[in-house]
Curated annotation (Swiss-Prot):
Residues 198-217 bind DNA. Keywords: Activator, Antibiotic biosynthesis, DNA-binding, Quorum sensing, Transcription, Transcription regulation. Belongs to the autoinducer-regulated transcriptional regulatory protein family. It holds the Pfam family GerE. Positive regulator of phenazine antibiotic production. May activate the phenazine biosynthetic genes by binding to a DNA sequence upstream of them, or to an intermediate gene which, in turn, interacts with them. GO terms for biological process: antibiotic biosynthetic process; quorum sensing; regulation of DNA-templated transcription. It comes from the Bacteria. This is Transcriptional activator protein PhzR. SMART domains: HTH_LUXR. It comes from Pseudomonas chlororaphis (Pseudomonas aureofaciens).
Amino acid sequence: MELGQQLGWDAYFYSIFARTMDMQEFTAVALRALRELRFDFFRYGMCSVTPFMRPRTYMYGNYPEDWVQRYQAANYAVIDPTVKHSKVSSSPILASNELFRGCPDLWSEANDSNLRHGLAQPSFNTQGRVGVLSLARKDNPISLQEFEALKVVTKAFAAAVHEKISELESDVRVFNTDVEFSGRECDVLRWTADGKTSEEIGVIMGVCTDTVNYHHRNIQRKIGASNRVQASRYAVAMGYI
């Protein structure tokens, strides 16, 4: 970790991850770095932006597999206070009884899995996608002094982890905004989001209703929506319009 202090934490983490070629190798390198900080576990989790009620959760790291399966099966991402925090803040947050007061079962099960002391660091990519880096240890509570000292480290680590996982994994629904809409499709989306019907959009854009509906079908196919209302809501949530 002395090298991290010399190079700067961003450069240090990017450099050690640059040599990793797959998730297994990446996880091993990440763990070696984190164990120097006395952490036993790490998880980088992301929630898909859609669907809204049951977003898909993606987790990477070495959290106990039974816990990961339980977390996903119980849809804990919806109530997890660290996930909620990550949507409104870029600052790290300490896990505590107080933080998890509203979801005691989640906190109890995490403790039962040896995830007793930890913190969460939000991370944002250039497309606005939100990820959460969670670090945990079995023993030794994190003091406020240690937490303050870790802030610059965890922020750099989370950014480097996000970029490397994005490189190694190809699930564009989570990490990228590879869907491309034409200018006309964007216009149709915006007018639909404003409550206009196909007929009204056709008049505004100077095209026939069938042409507007053709654009709607293409939009729904690209974004994975079942109807035009859902498509416009997804487009807003994902930052396309």
